[in-house]
C-alpha cells in the first residue's frame, strides 16, 4: 500500500499492530477504534471522515480530547466533520479532476475497437490531493 511505501521511504517500518480495519460506518469505526486505546499512539490517520467520526465518538466517550490527547487526520473533507468539534484536518481529493480523468479514459476506450480495449493496459494517473488544515492536529 502507498502508506507503507511512504513510511519505509522515511525509515519507518510499518507495524501491522497499529492498523485498524473498519467498515465505513461510524458505529463500526467506534468498535474498531478501541484498538487505538490499547496502543501508545497519539495520532491517527483515518481513511474516511466516517471512520474518523467513529474514533472521535469513542475518544469523547473515554473523556479523551482531540487534539489534546490524540491528533486525527482523515481522508474526504466531507461536510460530515461539521457534526463534531474540532473540525477535522483532512486530505481532500479534487472530485472534479477525478471525474474528468475517469471520463477522459472512458471516452478514449470507447473510441478503440473491441480487440484494442481487451489488450489495453491499465492506466495510472496521479491526482494530487490537498491537505485541508483544520483543528484536529496538535502541533508539536
Predicted regions and their residues:
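Bacterial carbohydrate/catabolite-sensing allosteric modules
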Residues: 1-140
Amino acid at each position: 500500500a502507498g502508506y507503507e511505501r511512504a513510511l519505509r521511504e522515511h525509515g519507518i517500518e510499518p507495524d501491522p499492530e497499529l492498523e485498524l480495519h473498519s467498515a465505513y460506518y461510524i458505529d463500526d469505526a467506534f468498535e474498531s477504534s478501541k484498538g487505538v486505546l490499547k496502543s501508545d499512539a497519539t495520532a491517527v490517520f483515518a481513511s474516511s471522515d466516517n471512520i474518523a467520526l467513529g474514533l472521535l465518538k469513542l475518544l469523547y466517550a473515554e473523556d479523551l480530547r482531540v487534539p489534546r490527547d490524540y491528533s486525527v487526520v482523515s481522508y474526504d473533507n466531507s461536510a460530515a466533520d461539521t457534526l463534531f468539534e474540532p473540525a477535522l484536518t483532512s486530505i481532500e481529493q479534487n472530485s472534479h479532476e477525478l471525474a474528468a480523468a475517469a471520463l477522459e479514459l472512458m471516452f478514449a476506450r470507447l473510441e478503440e475497437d473491441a480487440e484494442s480495449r481487451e489488450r489495453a493496459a491499465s492506466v495510472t494517473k496521479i491526482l494530487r490531493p490537498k491537505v485541508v488544515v483544520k483543528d484536529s492536529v496538535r502541533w508539536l
